[in-house]
Amino acid sequence: MSDYKSTLNLPETGFPMRGDLAKREPGMLARWTDDDLYGIIRAAKKGKKTFILHDGPPYANGSIHIGHSVNKILKDIIVKSKGLSGYDSPYVPGWDCHGLPIELKVEQEYGKPGEKFTAAEFRAKCREYAATQVDGQRKDFIRLGVLGDWSHPYLTMDFKTEANIIRALGKIIGNGHLHKGAKPVHWCVDCRSALAEAEVEYYDKTSPSIDVAFQAVDQDALKAKFGVSNVNGPISLVIWTTTPWTLPANRAISIAPDFDYALVQIDGQAVILAKDLVESVMQRIGVTDYTILGTVKGAELELLRFTHPFMGFDVPAILGDHVTLDAGTGAVHTAPGHGPDDYVIGQKYGLETANPVGPDGTYLPGTYPTLDGVNVFKANDIVVALLQEKGALLHVEKMQHSYPCCWRHKTPIIFRATPQWFVSMDQKGLRAQSLKEIKGVQWLPDWGQARIESMVANRPDWCISRQRTWGVPMSLFVHKDTEELHPRTLELMEEVAKRVEVDGIQAWWDLDAKEILGDEADQYVKVPDTLDVWFDSGSTHSSVVDVRPEFAGHAADMYLEGSDQHRGWFMSSLMISTAMKGKAPYRQVLTHGFTVDGQGRKMSKSIGNTVSPQDVMNKLGADILRLWVASTDYTGEMAVSDEILKRAADSYRRIRNTARFLLANLNGFDPAKDMVKPEEMVVLDRWAVGCAKAAQEDILKAYEAYDFHEVVQRLMRFCSVEMGSFYLDIIKDRQYTAKADSVARRSCQTALYHIAEALVRWMAPILSFTADEVWGYLPGEREKYVFTGEWYEGLFGLADSEAMNDAFWDELLKVRGEVNKVIEQARADKKVGGSLEAAVTLYAEPELAAKLTALGDELRFVLLTSGATVADYNDAPADAQQSEVLKGLKVALSKAEGEKCPRCWHYTQDVGKVAEHAEICGRCVSNVAGDGEKRKFA
């Protein structure tokens, strides 16, 4: 028997079947670095329209976690897809390098500043620590396949950036937004510093819940207000609080002007409460026998005075809109030094902003004999005992409630009035302008807009000063007597900024005021405060984007971070940009959800359900991690587990196998010589290119809308359905058995070439390593990297006016699906082995029959059977299978007649009819020794 294997065009490629990504990716990365791929892309895109995604800086502390990976991969997908869309999209990664977590790490190792090291040496250690953290994180980000200017990232501790942060503050001061005040701010007693909103987390805490009676100073005046004369015992206004330790700072009681307040007689005394809360309060304090003597509106009680239970002074009743009927008594204990609402109303009434608590959370000397020097949280029990002793405690119970805690220490924080510097929200209309700017930004998902609007509408002034060592100095001089800013503040700040640009922030602490103030130095003091780190990162639109040459003066198009950044980086950036420039720093803001495990639980080391990106890359490869990120709808929580990653790996194999099939069948194809013109191609091949064109339209639209899970779904559908289960199956016969240089085969290769050129580009933003690998095996002249080009423009489709248009082939797909069902049943019944052992008769109604007949003898190639005939629907025998999908179709199957050709495996009647090739069929004889078969349709 002759060996006809050598006459077949068998697929061949060096592109490996297995990805072996974990082993292969590091080598590709080394090549990208050696070639300076990022630089090559920048050179290729120079002069094109820009798209700037500004990197929100991760904090330079610790290893990257799965959330970091999600963030950086999403950014990279956008930057790469924009590049393919014809944009110049430079990506400059950044790091947030100042602030408390780094100080704490350095303190753990070296002690607090001033103990073993001077403050200057401590700062140097902080800088050193941050630099090592940046290096560690950078390696992992690069390993993810993220392309960017990793050799020149921006660090908020770069001298130039530190100088520009000072300049940003100068601009805000120049625009009139800064003010100084003793305001209550979130204060961590462990950090001994004010905290930003974004540094506060809420945890459950158990506190004493108490009802306290403040006795009226003028009992008769109150009786008159309520129109009563017979009251048994003293009259008191009752407050409710869960922070007894704040009572020494009480300076008023707030009530609502429009609520009804009742005077209630209980045993031996009368109490004033909101009428709607009388029943619940009586229940709480265990009183069943009570009488309401009278009611008045809250407004009637304004400025009546009540005695503080133990501080020896009296306080007024004042009117406030913040009073609610949700809980308590309808009368709110008001301590302007310990709460923002209290502070605001205190300002209105000219109350003292008392702050009896020191930075370490203990009462200052002279507060109250039994409280001086006591930690405020330990003082709760002392205050309760004191109230009991004075007869002012109506009720006490333990209550669990959500309480603000320090994000770093996880310990409860306090509101504490301290002299601080604030960016005012309303002094110069910053709030109103910010709310206006929000409307001009595209928020993705769109609920982000309402979220940040409500935060901006309700937020207090921003306390930007911190009492820290490792941070950008505020660089201010204030008069030692008046505490007013120096009249030449802006000029002086620029002078400081110039020095910081050369020597870093240490230049401020080394600065002798005389050097820039001259004789005035004796009248002014240097402000020791540093800036909130959110000011550092929030000003990068100015300190980085405005000054980096690759951004060429363009503002950022997009900020992209986790959804917690509405109150973090998105907010601080908006505040600073609006305060500096009157406009938002971004055009689009995209947020992604947090990662959770397969059961939807938050990632936690204690539960042991964390997924380490380093482990995933070392086991499965970065492309699997990238595919998981792209496949997941990032607008909600993003579930990840070993099982979910395994599914991503399965999807990856499908895409890789499709790419490998294309490459293997492009063996020996030179696009410069072998390309077939569209009008000369086999119709099915043109249809396949048209499928790629339709897929590309959907995929590009999804990339444009940042719907990456749609990109992956469409890519998978194209690989699995249109290609895998239809086209790629059908063409194997023609591809392998036709004459190597025939139009029939070259037409097919032309289609595969166009499809591969498009597919490799669709993959590139997501499966960057694999796309680079595929690119290296594609035939034809090309640039070295897929990332320097644009979407493929060589696709074309069938015209609707053609008889065999897309609708024609869509119907054929359905017919083939129905035939496959019949073949599968026959295989299960052991009537046939493979589909080529079958011959089918399609009984079809006239319209469908005409379409099927149009394919002539080539219908069998579409159906992958050795025989296919078309007959009248009404002639179908009883055992023909009625199609469930196409009502006008029945399918009958019989065993194919003739012998099996050992070359093409088809069963035909003409095997051995040609003496010189006695073992093969007539079609194969033509392909081996004759002019070759002609194919028009399939």
From Swiss-Prot:
Motif ('KMSKS' region): 602-606
Keywords: Acetylation, Aminoacyl-tRNA synthetase, ATP-binding, Cytoplasm, Ligase, Metal-binding, Nucleotide-binding, Protein biosynthesis, Zinc
Molecular function via GO: aminoacyl-tRNA deacylase activity; ATP binding; isoleucine-tRNA ligase activity; tRNA binding; zinc ion binding
Residues engaged in binding Zn(2+): 901, 904, 921, 924
N6-acetyllysine: residues carrying this PTM: 183
Coiled coil location: none
DNA repair as UniProt keyword: no
EC number(s) reported in the record: 6.1.1.5
List of residues binding ATP: 605
Amino-acid positions noted as binding L-isoleucyl-5'-AMP in the UniProt annotation, renumbered to this chain: 561
Note accompanying the cofactor annotation: Binds 1 zinc ion per subunit.
Residue ranges annotated as motif 'HIGH' region: 58-68
GO CC list: cytosol
InterPro entries membership: aa-tRNA-synth_I_CS, aa-tRNA-synth_Ia, Anticodon_Ile_BEm, Ile-tRNA-ligase, Ile-tRNA-ligase_type1, Ile-tRNA_ligase, M/V/L/I-tRNA-synth_anticd-bd, Rossmann-like_a/b/a_fold
Pfam family, one: Anticodon_1
UniProt main location, coarse: cytoplasm
Location(s), subcellular: Cytoplasm
Cofactor(s) this protein requires: Zn(2+)
Gene3D superfamilies recorded: 1.10.730.20, HUPs (3.40.50.620), Valyl/Leucyl/Isoleucyl-tRNA synthetase, editing domain (3.90.740.10)
Described purpose of this protein according to its UniProt entry: Catalyzes the attachment of isoleucine to tRNA(Ile). As IleRS can inadvertently accommodate and process structurally similar amino acids such as valine, to avoid such errors it has two additional distinct tRNA(Ile)-dependent editing activities. One activity is designated as 'pretransfer' editing and involves the hydrolysis of activated Val-AMP. The other activity is designated 'posttransfer' editing and involves deacylation of mischarged Val-tRNA(Ile).
Family classification: Belongs to the class-I aminoacyl-tRNA synthetase family. IleS type 1 subfamily.
UniProt note: domains: IleRS has two distinct active sites: one for aminoacylation and one for editing. The misactivated valine is translocated from the active site to the editing site, which sterically excludes the correctly activated isoleucine. The single editing site contains two valyl binding pockets, one specific for each substrate (Val-AMP or Val-tRNA(Ile)).
Subunit structure: Monomer.
The protein's name: Isoleucine--tRNA ligase
Taxonomic placement: Bacteria, Pseudomonadati, Pseudomonadota, Gammaproteobacteria, Enterobacterales
